[in-house]
Every structure is written in structure tokens, then in C-alpha cells.
Amino acid sequence: PFFQGLFSWDHMPYDDEVYAQDDTPSLVNMTSKALDLLMAQGKDKGFFLMVEAGRIDHANHYSMATRALSETLAMDRAVEETVKRVVGEEPLIIVTADHSHTLSVGGYPGRTADITGVVRGDTGWVMKADDGQPMSILRSVLMSVRF
């Protein structure tokens, strides 16, 4: 069986925006529905399903670290749904990225620090970035990148 789920003329909304729009399915909802259709029509012969979470990249390009993490978690939920649904079916599940880089956390934050927070020194003072603004933990990773 072959089908496509096209829900937008352009990019899909970010995952945190989906829930404010009643007519737009989330990545996990689209994945679940695709699995329903594929398992009903092609279970005997197997099937191929590609799920893309391209908004992770978009959020990173615009330095929206919290949103990039939210998008990564949405993809994680889609993979989790897939694993749960195809258990015992001898699946081959491949998760990859087109840029194949990792997310690093810099600035030596404390062990329990919120990675979306600011970098603090030993006595609690807030570290400043080159532009004089408070340095966020994730922003410290991007300090050497010039946009």
C-alpha cells in the first residue's frame, strides 16, 4: 500500500503549536494513523514507513533551543509509538538525521540545572555572553556560531 499524509501547504506547525489548532494532527497522531493503515493493509508482506521531524532543524537554525528540544521529544514519542505498535513483528526501525550532529550542553551548568536556564558561576553570578546578555546554557554551545 502507498499513501501520503499531507496536512499543510508549507511547513507543519511546531509541536507546541499543534495543540492550539484543532485540525492539525501531531507527529505521534500522524504516525499512529499511518501504522493503523499500513498494518491493516500490508501486515502480511511488511511495510515501509518514513516519519520526518524536520522542524527540529528549523528551530535550531533560528536558535530556538527549547522548541528544538520539544520537537525532538515529539519525534521520540513517534518512535515510542512505533516500537509499541510493532512489537513482536520483527521490525527494523532506523532513526537518523540529515545533519547527524549532537546537541551539546556547555557552560558547565550544575547537575540539576534546567538546560534552558542561564549559566551561573560558583557563587551564583550569571555569566555574560559576548554581547553582554545573560548566557543561556544552550546558547553557550552556539557561542562560536555566527549567524
Please give the residue ranges for each predicted region.
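A post-motif C-terminal structural segment
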Residues: 1-147
